[in-house]
Amino acid sequence: MFYPHHQSQQSTTTNPSKHHDSQDVRLPGTSSWSRHPSHPSFTPSLPMPSPSGYPPLGSGYPPGGHHHPNVNVHSGIHGPHPSFGSGMGGNGGMGHGQGFGMGMFQNGVQTSPPRGEPVPMTSHWQTQMMRAEASRSASSPHHRARAAAISSRATNKPSAVPIVDPNNRPSSSYGTNGLHRKNASSVFNGEPTGTPPLSDPSLTPAQNPAEPATPAPVAGQTESKDEEKPNEPWTGLDLGGIRLKRLSTALFSFTHVTSLYINHNALTSIPSAISSLRQLTLLDATGNELSTIPSEIGVLSKLKDLLLFDNNLTTLPFELGTLYQLDCLGIDGNPMNADYRKKLVEDGTRGLITYLRDHAPPPPPPPERQWIDLETDVDTPTSGKQESFSVLTYNILCASFAPATTYSYTPSWALDWDYRKRLLLEEIVTASADVVCLQEIDCKQYADYFYPMLKKEGYEGQHYPRSRAKTMSVDEQKLVDGCATFWKEEKFRLVETQVIEFNQLALQKTDMRTEDMFNRVMSRDNIAVVAALEFRASGGRLLVANSHIYWDHRYRDVKLVQIGMLMEELEKIVEQFSRYPVKLDTDPEYNNGKPPKYERSEKGRDIPLIMCVDLNSFSGSAVYDYLSSGSIPGDHEDFMSHLYGRYTASGLKHHLGLRSACAGIGEMRMTNFTPTFAAAIDYVFYTPRTMKVTSVLGDVDKAYLDKTVGFPNAHFPSDHIPVFTQFRIKGHLDPLPLNGDPYH
C-alpha cells in the first residue's frame, strides 16, 4: 500500500491495551509509504434439509426402500458419546455409525469409535448432537437429491415445489450484513429489494433512523461484490455418499451454488478453490477423511452451516473467525482440540467463531497501493511555474457507527477505536497530503485527537458537525459526526470557511416547500463544509468543498436534491470569492511574475475548485452524472415521482464544469469494502478548466481483497479507503465553448 500498515502481534480480547497504549503517531512494525464431478446430481433447488437442517423424510431411508449395505446399524444408544457422537437406529431400518468416518474407514471396514471424557450436555452441545444425527442419516448416495425428487413426485402439483434455497434462513442475530445501521427490510444479503411504494411507512421521518454512513446498494444495480446471479434452475449440489476421493476444480465454476453436499465420501482434502463459491450458505463434509480444511473457507462469509462431523480434524484454521453468519459449526466425531471443543460446548458456534477471530494472528499486509500517472507534472514556458498540490479524502468510520454487532467479522481489537484512530492518523500523516478532507469525524475526536495531533504535523483545520448538534446538550454534541477539512499551513492561508446545512437550505426555499421536501429532505441533516484557501507563494486561490451525502438508495431523490442545493451554494460562494482583492505580494517565480487574476465575467468559475465527497452512489448514478455533466432533467427516474418545485419542473443545472479525478482510470474498483458491498462511492471532483490531475493512488491489491472478507481489519481502520490525488494548476483558463457551457 502507499502507506504503512500496522502488523500487530497476535492479540486477544483480554489484553487489548497492547494495541493502543501509546499515543505515538508511528506504529511499530510499519513500513514506509512510499470438475465436473464424477457422479453429479443436480437438483432444482434441493429442499434438502429443512431450514432446521434435519432430513425432511425422517432419519431413515426415503420411501422406496433403498438400502445402503455399508452402513452399520446401532440401536437404542440413549447416551451419545460426548466426543464422537452417537449411533441411533434410523426409521425404516436405516442405521448409521459413529466415530471417525461414520464408523467406516477405507474399504468399508467398520471400527469402534475411540472413547473420550464425557462432555456436559449443554444446550449448545444438544444442538450439535441433533445436527450430527441429521447429517449421519444422509449417508446413502445422493440422499438429499433423492429426497427432493421423491418430495416432488409426492405432490399432484409439481409447480408447488418452490425453487428456493432451503437454507436461506433469516440472518443470524449474532451479526448484521456489514452495512452499519442499515434498515434490514430494504436489503437482504446486500441486494436491493427495489424501491418501496410511496405509502411505505418506513419512509416517514419518524420511523426512519438517523443516517448511517455506509451505503446500501443502489436500486437497479446488483451488489458489486457478487456476480450477477445466473438463470440457473438449481442452487443445490449433492455429491454425498458416492465415495469420492477428490474434487475436481471444475466443480468450483458453479459459483451460484448455495448448498454443497460432499458428505460420506473418501475425501482427504478440500481444494482451496472452494473460495470461489461465495454464495454458499451450507457446506456438508460429514463422514470423510479430512485432517485439515482450507483456510480459504473463511472468505465464504454467507455460510450458515459448516458441517464437518466424523472426520480426522484436530484443529481449525483461525480464518473461520470471519464467518460471522455461521449458525452451526459441526465438529462432533473429530479428535478436536480440547479447547475448541470446550468453547463450543460452553458458548456454542458463535463463541468458538469469536474465539478464532480474536485470537487469529494478523495476516500479511497488502502490497503498497501504486500511483497511476495521468499527466506530466511539469511547467510550460507560457504559463511559468505553477502550483502543485495533493488532496486526500477519507471516510474514517465514526466510532459510534461501528458496533461489534455490525462489524462482527472484525477482530475486537482491530475494531477498538483506540487502535483504529492511531492507524488512521498514521495513514494521514504518512500520506502528507496538502489538503485532507475527512467524513464521519465526531466533535470529540476532532477536538481531542485529530486536530492536536495534525497540528503537530503542520496542519490547520476546521470541523462542523451535522445539524442535529444544535438541538443537543454539550455532552451529546461531542458524539455527533460531521466533516473536517485540514490544510498545510506552510502552503495555504485560510480566507474563510462556510458550512452548508441541507435541511436548513430546504427550509429557506419558499418556492420548493412541497410535502416531499418537508417529509423526505428536511429530516436529513447532512452537511457540506467549504474552505476558501489561498496559496501563500503564488497568491492563487483554491476552493475546497467537503461533503457527505445521504446513504439510502430508497431516497435517491433526496440525494439529487442535496447535490442540487450544494451546487447552487457553491456557485454563489465561488462568485463571492472572485470578488476578493488580488494578493499582490507574491513569489515572482510563479506565473511569470504576474499576480493571479480572476475575471468578474467568469463569476468565479476561473477559480480552481475541489469537491471531496462521500457520494454514497456509484458512477453512472443520477448524482454522479449530474456532477459530471452539469444537468439532470426534472423527470429523471431518480426523482421517483416526488415533487420538488423547480427541481422537478425544469431539472437541475450547474455551470461549474466538474469531473471526477479518477475518471481517467474508469474510477476506483472500490472505496467501500464490506462482506456484502464493495464499490466506489467516494470521489474527488475538480474543475478541469483550471487544473489537471497528474496522478491518482490506485486500487488495493486484488489478491489481498480476494482473501479478505471486509474492512475494517488489522490493516485498514475504516470500511472505506482514502482517495488520494495529485493536481497541478494550469496557469491559464481553457476557453469555453461558444455557448458558454463548460460541459458542451
Swiss-Prot record:
Annotated SUPFAM superfamilies: DNase I-like, L domain-like
Region (Disordered) location: 1-100, 132-238
Enzyme Commission (EC) number: 3.1.13.4
InterPro entries per the UniProt record, alphabetical: CCR4/nocturin_mRNA_transcr, Endo/exonu/phosph_ase_sf, Endo/exonuclease/phosphatase, Leu-rich_rpt, Leu-rich_rpt_typical-subtyp, LRR_dom_sf
Cofactor(s) needed: Mg(2+)
Main location: cytoplasm
Family statement: Belongs to the CCR4/nocturin family.
Protein's recorded name: CCR4-Not complex 3'-5'-exoribonuclease subunit Ccr4
Annotated organism of origin: Cryptococcus neoformans var. neoformans serotype D (strain JEC21 / ATCC MYA-565) (Filobasidiella neoformans)
Lineage: Eukaryota, Fungi, Dikarya, Basidiomycota, Agaricomycotina
Record gene name: CCR4
